[in-house]
Curated annotation (Swiss-Prot):
Record organism: Euglena gracilis
InterPro entries assigned to the protein according to its UniProt record, in alphabetical order: ATP_synth_F1_dsu/esu, ATP_synth_F1_dsu/esu_N, ATPsynth_dsu/esu_N
UniProt family annotation: Belongs to the ATPase epsilon chain family.
UniProt entry keywords in alphabetical sequence: ATP synthesis, CF(1), Chloroplast, Hydrogen ion transport, Ion transport, Membrane, Plastid, Thylakoid, Transport
GO molecular function list: ATP binding; proton-transporting ATP synthase activity, rotational mechanism
Disulfide bonds listed in the record: none
Subunit and partners: F-type ATPases have 2 components, CF(1) - the catalytic core - and CF(0) - the membrane proton channel. CF(1) has five subunits: alpha(3), beta(3), gamma(1), delta(1), epsilon(1). CF(0) has three main subunits: a, b and c.
Protein name: ATP synthase epsilon chain, chloroplastic
Domain of life: Eukaryota
Listed CDD domains: F1-ATPase_delta
Claim: Mitochondrion is one of the keywords in the record: no
HAMAP family: ATP_synth_epsil_bac
């Protein structure tokens, strides 16, 4: 038996697959989900979703920017603001974005902008980290 996973962004259903295992970036840390998981609704942080598809040892990685996951009856429904496949992210651009986001936060003197810059850094970090998983 497997899990039916749907990742939904505001514009459309981004990705639907039958998978063996999924690891989610929840607000309280990473959470692995296998078949027959207890029902749960959890908040998702900016981070990396890892998915192992049926009959495979390979993992698919996606970067998501916050949202929710509902796990019920071997269905995983993920609602996020943005999603992007790790395999489609340019390594050099991700590193440049990460470094510039980090620098912008370090140089920030405006308390009001700190929250926005912190979110930008988390997203840039996740995009850069997912490129390192491809190696």
């Amino acid at each position: 038996m497997t899990l039916d996973v749907s990742i939904i962004i505001p514009e459309r259903v981004f990705w639907e697959k039958r998978v063996e295992e999924i690891i989610l970036p929840t607000l309280s840390g990473q959470m692995g989900v296998l078949k027959d998981h207890i029902p749960i609704l959890t908040g998702l942080d900016i981070g990396i979703i890892l998915v192992r598809q049926k009959s495979s040892s390979d993992w698919t990685s996606l970067v998501v920017t916050g949202g929710f996951a509902l796990i019920n009856s071997n269905n995983v429904t993920i609602l996020v603001n943005e999603a992007e496949f790790g395999s489609e992210i340019n390594v050099e651009q991700a590193q440049i974005s990460y470094n510039s986001s980090k620098h912008a936060l370090e140089m920030n003197k405006d308390i009001k902008r700190k929250f926005e810059l912190t979110l930008n850094l988390k997203k840039a970090r996740a995009r850069f980290q997912v490129t390192q998983l491809k190696k």
